Design a protein with these regions (language model features):
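A cross-kingdom feature marking solvent-exposed beta-strand/loop segments within repeated
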Residues: 43-64, 134-142
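Compact, well-ordered interaction domains used in eukaryotic information-processing assemblies
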Residues: 50-55, 62-88
Length: 187
């Protein structure tokens, strides 16, 4: 499962995020990966943003790996609407990751069934935002709509479920190996 979210804008300050499950080749333990890239350009005629020009600039993109416990924390933060922070250090990079809830006001157009007139109604919906800050000055951020955050939550649940399956299978195989080994000692 892979989730791609692109949010370019005309001020050329948008970002694209990718969320996906990867696994360790040796033991098949799954992890959540988040890749983020800064918007490179904006085509005002076509009203579309491009990210590909930032691909080769290491300061314009980032990749982060999360374990199953961090996936559990993400799910808990989403379900209980609290801010979740974590810190990763790799080589010379120090990275702060923050998932924050916020209330987004949207406007819906509705039709009055009696008068057949349209009217607008404001509604507050639960949204989230992710901000990733590397080395204090490289910032990657994206707002997340309710549907997007639900998909991320399902991806995190899938990773935890697969982790449980893999480790349970490994434990069963280990037990079978112990049964096949004869020993003069009992433990």
């Amino acid at each position: 499962m892979s989730i791609q979210i692109y949010k370019p804008n005309k001020t050329n300050s948008g970002f694209a995020f990718s969320f996906y499950m990867g696994e360790n080749l040796k033991d098949k333990i799954p992890s959540l990966f988040i890749n983020a890239i800064s918007q490179h350009s904006w085509d005002d005629k076509r009203k579309i943003g491009s990210f590909s020009g930032s691909k080769s600039d290491p300061e314009k993109n980032i990749s982060i790996k999360f374990n199953h416990f961090e996936c559990g924390s993400i799910i808990s933060a989403i379900n209980n609407r609290f801010e979740w922070n974590t810190y990763h250090a790799y080589e010379d990079n120090k990275t702060q990751i923050k998932l924050s809830p916020w209330d987004k006001v949207i406007t819906n157009t509705k039709i009055n069934s009696k008068t057949k007139e349209s009217y607008e109604e404001k509604t507050t919906i639960p949204a989230f935002g992710i901000v990733i800050t590397r080395n204090g000055n490289q910032v990657f951020k994206i707002p997340l709509e309710p549907g997007e955050i639900e998909c991320i939550k399902i991806l995190c649940k899938s990773i935890i479920s697969k982790y449980c399956d893999v480790t349970s299978s490994a434990n069963r195989n280990q037990e079978k190996s112990k049964d096949n080994i004869s020993s003069d000692y009992e433990f």
